[in-house]
Amino acid sequence: MLGNTELLLRILADVPPAGIVEGAYLFAQTEPNQQSVFVAGRELIERERVHKLLISDCRPKSGYIGAVAYRRAMIESGIPAGVIEEVPMEPTEILHTQIESQRVVRFAEAQGYRRLIVVSSPFHQERAFITMVTAALRQYPSLKLYSVPGAPQPWDEVVTHSQGTLQGTRAELIAEEQKRIEKYTIQGDLLPRQTILQYLRARD
């Protein structure tokens, strides 16, 4: 239990890497939650922490408004167009956290990335980071991943999540996220939390 608490705190308050990182991946969000990752991404660019903000190239599906609209919304939120880069994920019938993570790690390896920042909405950040680390350890273990949660939004606001099929307050979605972490770990889709914690302890 203590290990789980340490992992969660490390994910939510990760020590930022030195220098400028090659890129930060902004996980696909449903529209009510996307501003959270846009704010975090804009701050990373303004503080010169990353060169690129990566997004999924998918068309609208699974609650994601699609790359064209996502890019437009990012620019409207103050992010320079030139820093946005799409990660190939099509063709895919659906879009979910594991698909995003596997394709992003593949992209990072192809581009020669050594480091990558992972950004998602706060209630999804733990599962997003665990999934990305799982993909990296299985596909590209030398990749160093860092966690930067999205900006907080009202916890009691009712929103959609999980491919646009789940609805509840952001606070209620915390429990749903924990259920998914447990389920996908048992299935073998995610590495155990202790393995992720060991990765973070050894990363730097």
Model-found features: residue ranges?
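A conserved mid-domain beta-alpha-beta active-site/ligand-binding segment of alpha/beta enzyme cores
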Residues: 91, 162-165, 169-204
